[in-house]
Design a protein with these regions (language model features):
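Juxtamembrane/disordered regions of integral membrane proteins
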Residues: 1-142
Length: 142
C-alpha cells in the first residue's frame, strides 16, 4: 500500500476548499435569488448574533480549509480500496456528510440548532461531492 502524500493532500484540500466556495456561491446564491432561502438568514434569526470582522472571516476560511483537508484525507485513506476515480470521491464526501448530518440532527433534536439547519445540509450534499471530485483530480500518492 502506498503512503499518503501529505503535500498533495494539503494542496488537494485547498483546491477542494476553493471549489466548495465556488459551488456554494452558485447553489446558495441561486436558492436565495429564486426562493429567498438563505442558510445564513436562518442561523442569524435563530441565534440573534451578527459576527463580522477580519478575524471572523479568517477563522471561517481556516475552518473550511481544515474540513476540506480532512475530507481529502478520508479520500486518500479509502482510495486504495475503492480506486482512484469519481466514485471514491463521492463515497468520501458522503461519509463525511453523514457524520456532519448526524451531528446536526443530534443538535436539532437537543434544540441547540434550528430545524432549518437541514437546508444547509441539503446544500452540502451538492457542494461536498463536487469539491472532493475537484480535489481528487489534484491528489496523487507519493
Amino acid at each position: 500500500m502506498k503512503k499518503i502524500n501529505s503535500g498533495r493532500l494539503v494542496l488537494a484540500g485547498l483546491v477542494a476548499s476553493f471549489a466548495f466556495i465556488f459551488v456554494e456561491i452558485i447553489v446558495e446564491g441561486s436558492m436565495h435569488f429564486l426562493f429567498r432561502i438563505s442558510e445564513a438568514k436562518f442561523y442569524l434569526e435563530a441565534f440573534e448574533m451578527r459576527k463580522s470582522g477580519v478575524l471572523f472571516h479568517i477563522l471561517n476560511l481556516g475552518i473550511l480549509f481544515a474540513i476540506c483537508i480532512l475530507i481529502m484525507w478520508v479520500y486518500a485513506a479509502i482510495r486504495p480500496r475503492f480506486g482512484s476515480h469519481g466514485k471514491t470521491a463521492i463515497v468520501a464526501s458522503l461519509i463525511f456528510w453523514l457524520f456532519a448530518f448526524l451531528f446536526t440532527a443530534n443538535h436539532v433534536n437537543l434544540g441547540i440548532f434550528p430545524p432549518m439547519s437541514f437546508i444547509g445540509m441539503g446544500f452540502n450534499l451538492i457542494e461536498l461531492p463536487v469539491a472532493v471530485i475537484v480535489g481528487s483530480a489534484i491528489y496523487r500518492e507519493g
